[in-house]
């Protein structure tokens, strides 16, 4: 009888490679539906807002560019970030920011949306943020350090803006009392 041949069993098929992890989805920017916003301002407030709005109208058309919306909002006492302004505008491109114009009736729901935002920092939040830079624990921060922070972190300010903001705030040692500074900023 012939010797038995070793019959090799076919190798098991290699395990399929794991499916690649799906690319992380970009967090969806929730759009603000301005048409659904209920205007809660009094007639007197609306008249005041319109008066301020028209001060920014450079052409006499009773319209402002999208790039001016943040300035008007801030002039009216709100403190939205640039990101919040862009969000309420529908995230327009830089070209649209300078080219597109809106009327007061389009601006009012934006003002209401920003006013409804409860996440805006208050006096204590700003003081607490600056206290981090108070190395001596004496209520002051170095003017040079504050300039650097304002120009390089978060929503970066231009050097001219920083200088205008800090004008008259430093003492003879180059230090700034940050509680007085925050009061000054919030009153402007």
Swiss-Prot record:
The modification N,N,N-trimethylalanine is found at residue 2. The keyword Lipoprotein does not apply. It comes from the Eukaryota. Keywords: Acetylation, Methylation, Motor protein, Muscle protein, Myosin, Phosphoprotein, Repeat. GO terms for biological process: muscle contraction. CDD domains: EFh. InterPro entries: CALM/Myosin/TropC-like, EF-hand-dom_pair, EF_hand_dom. Residues 1-30 are annotated as: Disordered. This is Myosin light chain 1/3, skeletal muscle isoform. It comes from Mus musculus (Mouse). The gene is Myl1.
């Amino acid at each position: 009888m012939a010797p038995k041949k070793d019959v090799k069993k076919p190798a098991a098929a290699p395990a399929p490679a794991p499916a690649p992890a799906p690319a992380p989805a970009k967090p969806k920017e929730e759009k603000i539906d301005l048409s659904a916003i209920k205007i809660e301002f009094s007639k007197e407030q609306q008249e005041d807002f319109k008066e301020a709005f028209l001060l920014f109208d450079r052409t006499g058309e009773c319209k402002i560019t999208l790039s001016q919306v943040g300035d008007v909002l801030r002039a009216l006492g709100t403190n939205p970030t640039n990101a919040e302004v862009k969000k309420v505008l529908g995230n327009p491109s830089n070209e649209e920011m300078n080219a597109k114009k809106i009327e007061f009736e389009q601006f009012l729901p934006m003002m209401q949306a920003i006013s409804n935002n409860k996440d805006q920092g208050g006096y204590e939040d700003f003081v607490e943020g600056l206290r981090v830079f108070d190395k001596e624990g004496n209520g002051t921060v170095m003017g040079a350090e504050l300039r650097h922070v304002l120009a390089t972190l978060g929503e970066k300010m231009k050097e001219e803006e920083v200088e205008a903001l800090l004008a008259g705030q430093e003492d003879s040692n180059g230090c700034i009392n940050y509680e007085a500074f925050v009061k000054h900023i919030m009153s402007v």
